[in-house]
From Swiss-Prot:
Residues 10-204 form the tr-type G domain. GTP hydrolase that promotes the GTP-dependent binding of aminoacyl-tRNA to the A-site of ribosomes during protein biosynthesis. The gene is tuf1. Keywords: Cytoplasm, Elongation factor, GTP-binding, Hydrolase, Magnesium, Metal-binding, Nucleotide-binding, Protein biosynthesis. This is Elongation factor Tu. It is an enzyme of class 3 (hydrolase).
Length: 394
C-alpha cells in the first residue's frame, strides 16, 4: 500500500471525538470518514478498524488512540478517537493528541452523563478551544420537546465550564443511520463538517507564534562566545534579534549573533529545527539547561500554578502506593526537573495510582510557562505522572 502524498495545500486541523461511553463516538468517527469520502473523496474507515485502536506511548504512558483523516473542500482534518474513558483522560492531559477543536457526542436517548461533564471539564482545563456538539441517536427519539430539553442541558453544561453554550453549534443526527447510507442522516454529517469548517478557526502555525527555544545544552566557543543548543519550539530567530533568557534565574537579555545547524551558519532558525544560537555578552555559567530563549516579553517565569494531572497506575510502571499532601516529586518541564510541593483539592486526602486530579503546584525555581504547558511528574528519573498547566497563579 503506497503512502498517499501529504497534501500541503489545505489548512491542517486537529480534532477529536469526546463524550460518555457508548454514546456513539466511534460510530460517528466511522460515519464522518464514510460520508465525507463518498461526498468529497478520500478513504472511508470501518467501525472495527477504528475501535481496535493501537497502543501508543506519550511521556512514558500507554494510550490507545485511533487516528483517522478526512477532507472537506477547504480543509484536511486529523481526527482522534479513543476506545476507553481512561484513554481520553490520558490523551487530553499528556497532549498526545492536541485538539484545535472537539466534537462532543451526546446520545439524545440519555442526555448528558457523568463522563460528558468530565470531558467538558477536561477540555476546559487542558485548553481545548472549541467544542461542537453532535446529538446522536436522534432517530430513536420522536419527541421534539425531549430533544430540545437535552439540547438545553448540554448548553447549560458547556456554559458552566466557560464554553459559550448559547452559541455552540449543535447537530441532531444518527451516526449509525448515516453509516448505513440513509441520505437524510448523511446530510447531518455534512452539516457537522460544515460547522467544523466554520466554527473552528484555522489554527495558528508554530512558525507564526513568538520565538521560543528550550535550552538543552550550553557551550563556550573560544573567540566567539556562548552557544546554546536546542530545538526551536515555535517562531523564528534571526541573527541580530534581541532575546530573553527566562526561567530558573532572573530574566536576562542578550542578542543573537549567529545561528548554526549541522555546522553551517544560517541567518535564521525556524520552528522544528535543531539549532545552535550564539549569544552576545553571556558567560557560559550564566545560562543553563531548563531555561528558554524567547522573544522579549512573550513568556514569564512562574513558580505556582493550578494543574490537571494523571498519576500512572502500577501496571503502567507508576507508583505502587498512594501519595498524600506533603508529596514533593520533581516536575519535568521541557528539558529539566524542578522539585515542587503540591496542594490537593478540599476533601481529598490521598491520590491513588491511576487517578486524575486537579492540584496546585509550587516549584522551588521559576520556570518559563504559559497555560497549556505539559509536564511529567518524576521520582528519581522515573515518570510517575503527567500533567498540564491549567492556570498560572504566580
Amino acid at each position: 500500500m503506497s503512502k498517499e502524498k501529504f497534501e500541503r495545500t489545505k489548512p491542517h486541523v486537529n480534532v477529536g471525538t469526546i463524550g460518555h461511553v457508548d454514546h456513539g463516538k466511534t460510530t460517528l468517527t466511522a460515519a464522518i470518514t464514510t460520508v465525507l469520502a463518498k461526498t468529497y473523496g478520500g478513504s472511508a474507515r470501518a467501525f472495527d478498524q477504528i475501535d481496535n485502536a493501537p497502543e501508543e506511548k506519550a511521556r512514558g504512558i500507554t494510550i490507545n488512540t485511533s487516528h483517522v483523516e478526512y477532507d472537506t473542500p477547504t480543509r484536511h482534518y486529523a481526527h482522534v478517537d479513543c476506545p476507553g474513558h481512561a484513554d481520553y483522560v490520558k490523551n487530553m492531559i499528556t497532549g498526545a493528541a492536541q485538539m484545535d477543536g472537539a466534537i462532543l457526542v451526546v446520545a439524545a436517548t440519555d442526555g448528558p452523563m457523568p463522563q460528558t461533564r468530565e470531558h467538558i471539564l477536561l477540555g476546559r482545563q487542558v485548553g481545548v478551544p472549541y467544542i461542537i456538539v453532535f446529538l446522536n441517536k436522534c432517530d430513536m427519539v420522536d419527541d421534539e420537546e425531549l430533544l430540545e430539553l437535552v439540547e438545553m442541558e448540554v448548553r447549560e453544561l458547556l456554559s458552566q465550564y466557560d464554553f459559550p453554550g448559547d452559541d455552540t453549534p449543535i447537530v441532531r443526527g444518527s451516526a449509525l443511520k448515516a453509516l448505513e447510507g440513509d441520505a437524510e442522516w448523511e446530510a447531518k454529517i455534512i452539516e457537522l463538517a460544515g460547522h467544523l469548517d466554520s466554527y473552528i478557526p484555522e489554527p495558528e502555525r508554530a512558525i507564526d507564534k513568538p520565538f521560543l527555544l528550550p535550552i538543552e545544552d550550553v557551550f563556550s566557543i573560544s573567540g566567539r562566545g556562548t552557544v546554546v543548543t536546542g530545538r526551536v519550539e515555535r517562531g523564528i530567530i534571526k541573527v541580530g534579534e534581541e532575546v530573553e533568557i527566562v526561567g530558573i534565574k532572573d530574566t536576562a537579555k542578550s542578542t543573537c549573533t549567529g545561528v548554526e545547524m549541522f555546522r553551517k551558519l544560517l541567518d535564521e532558525g525556524r520552528a522544528g529545527e535543531n539549532v545552535g544560537v550564539l549569544l552576545r555578552g553571556i558567560k557560559r555559567e550564566e545560562i543553563e539547561r531548563g531555561q528558554v530563549l524567547a522573544k522579549p516579553g512573550s513568556i514569564k517565569p512562574h513558580t505556582k500554578f493550578e494543574s490537571e494531572v494523571y498519576i500512572l497506575s502500577k501496571d503502567e510502571g507508576g507508583r505502587h502506593t498512594p501519595f498524600f499532601k506533603g508529596y514533593r516529586p520533581q516536575f519535568y518541564f521541557r528539558t529539566t526537573d524542578v522539585t515542587g510541593t503540591i496542594e490537593l483539592p478540599e476533601g481529598v486526602e490521598m491520590v491513588m495510582p491511576g487517578d486524575n486530579i486537579k492540584m496546585v503546584v509550587t516549584l522551588i525555581h521559576p520556570i518559563a510557562m504559559d497555560d497549556g504547558l505539559r509536564f511529567a511528574i518524576r521520582e528519581g528519573g522515573r515518570t510517575v505522572g503527567a500533567g498540564v498547566v491549567a492556570k498560572v497563579l504566580g
